[in-house]
Amino acid sequence: MNIVDCKSALKTLNNGLPIVFPTDTLPAIGCLPKFSNTIYEFKKRDRDKPLILMGSEYQQLINYVHESAKEDYENIASKYWPGALTMVIPASEKQTTILTSNDLTLGLRIPNSYMAQSLMRLSLIHI
């Protein structure tokens, strides 16, 4: 496996291809949100299971959270992130269904990994 820098990984992401990167738990397969169908197809993932959207800080992901869940999201995120916790939470109605599972939920996480957070900060997007 080649180890590449964040800028090379970002170029791959911008070309619509997935990357594998380390997190604080297991390696992640990631892509830009607009290419999320790639992950469902690549992993043969059931559409009933939400994908995990990662960011470098919890405020980055607040717009993906349904209005009814924002208070709980902020309370839990500020206490447990960065870290290994993935929140499965109702997705904002503003977000496209391409990012959500069939039940309109989304997994959100801020990994406690310098490399993962650097990649997300550099890209100014979420993976």
What are these regions (language model features)?
Residues M1-H126:
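Active-site-adjacent structural elements in enzyme catalytic cores
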